[in-house]
Amino acid sequence: MPPAPAGTIAPAGTIAPAEAVTPLLRGIAVLRRLTEAPGGTLSLSALEKTTGLARSTVDRLTATLARMGHVRLDGRDVTLAPRLMELGNAYLAALRLPALLSARADELADELDESVSLAVGDRDGIRFIHQATRRRAMSLSFRIGDLLPAERTAPGPLFAADWTEADWRHWRERRAADPADHTFPAVPPSEHPTPDEDFVLRTAKAATNDHALDDQLIEPGLVALSVPVRDPGTGRVACVASVVSHTSRHTAPDLRTALLPRLRAAVAAMEDDLRTAPPPAPAPPRAGLATWTGASKQELGREFVESLARGLTVLTAFDEGRSALTLTQVAQATGLARATARRALITLGHADLLAPAPGNTFTLTPRVLSLGFPPLSRTSLPEIAQPHLTALADRVHESTSLAVLSESGEEIQYTARASTTRVLSARVTVGARLPARDTAPGHVLLALPEARTQGYALVDEELEAGLRSLAVPVRDRTGRVVAALNVAMHAARRTAAACRTDILPELSRTATLIEADLSVAGRFVHVPPT
């Protein structure tokens, strides 16, 4: 069989199967390099260098990912986009644990005033699937999807208690090859790696005590206490719940003494929730996926890498109630030919994103979260909206902005904006506050009768002579209005009627685009409004 092509993500010491789809492996490599980059952004030349791919290949791969909404192209820079989170969402939905247990974790965090996390095992590491953090000067910086080495965490020994000899061998090989943990970008490098035997002993102790401690193994000051959440049907560890603190608040022994009983009670409630949860109703598969990729290929030609788009589409076939799928089910869900779906499954399995399961089925692995989820899980609503605001301002040639309602409900606060270069333009700075009842965004956010009936608000010269403002609501995935999208202009440039015919359709279209991104980003993650 041929060796893995340059820029693919073949596991160390393995070669890609003959049936593997090379463009799909290369696209996955691009996404992983972007995930590891600061801010989820790299230049095209940096991607060329870090993946080892030809520049023309990088250009086609990123153009395809941009067409899918997974990245954003800004000149020579490539940035991860919120729509990419649909891949991680597929894993989290199929897993069901965040949907069933996150409320318990959030309640525990509120009660203890400490950060609480849920994590699953990922080969020789642990990966976060939920975070309930506290806002403090010293706060937890780990993100959903971050991968940590098992031996430097509290959950690690609890997962290692179920490792096979092959798992332990793989772990020792990894430690020998990377003693400083450079392959785990979420943690600082280990300056003084502990002996392997230390983790073996911690694992044996965790198996006996059914809990584990992290006493500043990741960095000085960080301590954690973990208890396993077991699957009621199998008794195996489904995930691990952890309370994380700082030595300025708790020492590691103090965590065990003061918080272990409450953590155990919360875990018992989680296990009850798993036991009594009704079977999931299978989510309907997304229709027309194969048709969409074919149409995009027709439109863009060789600049659209259809095999990459189809391969990533296979990941989205999984969902709640669709956690284990056969080849036939994947082909039916995506509209792909069986042969195409089969090659995609083989490739995704080689990339450690899929694993075989009983009954000739496949399941997603936690490694799906390595495709952009950690940096994107911290995305705020203004960050989601900003590129859409800029595009809207370019189309209508007027200043655009996003605003939210203050806690008092008496003011609006501008959280994002895009300006034009007109001699006369509305200039409102991010962070500025204005009376809600005197502004179009305020009318929308307050749901005043006329704005609620029309679905938009048009305000003339209430704040300043000559200023005309038009706003529409932005809703989250539950339908709740969370922000207002606004275009402001000088009244002399357009009549009120012209605003409704020329600006309102563009404004509504942009709000729909923001809502689509917000719906994906907010499925399993809290998206801050500011």
What are these language model-derived features?
Residues 105-117, 203, 389-397, 401-404, ...:
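Short regulatory alpha-helical segment in sensory/regulatory domains of signaling proteins that mediates
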Residues 220-228, 465-474:
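A short beta-strand signature within small-molecule sensing/ligand-binding domains used
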Residues 1-89, 272, 291-373, 512, ...:
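N-terminal helix-turn-helix
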Residues 117-123, 131-132, 402-408, 415-418:
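Short hydrophobic alpha-helical segments used for membrane anchoring or interfacial signaling
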Residues 204, 209, 237-301, 452-454, ...:
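Juxtadomain coupling helices with adjacent low-complexity linkers
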Residues 230-236, 475-481:
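Flexible loop/coil segments at beta-strand boundaries within sensory signal-transduction domains
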Residues 140-218, 406, 412-465:
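Short, solvent-exposed recognition segments
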Residues 83-110, 140, 367-395, 413-414:
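Conserved segment of winged-helix/HTH DNA-binding domains
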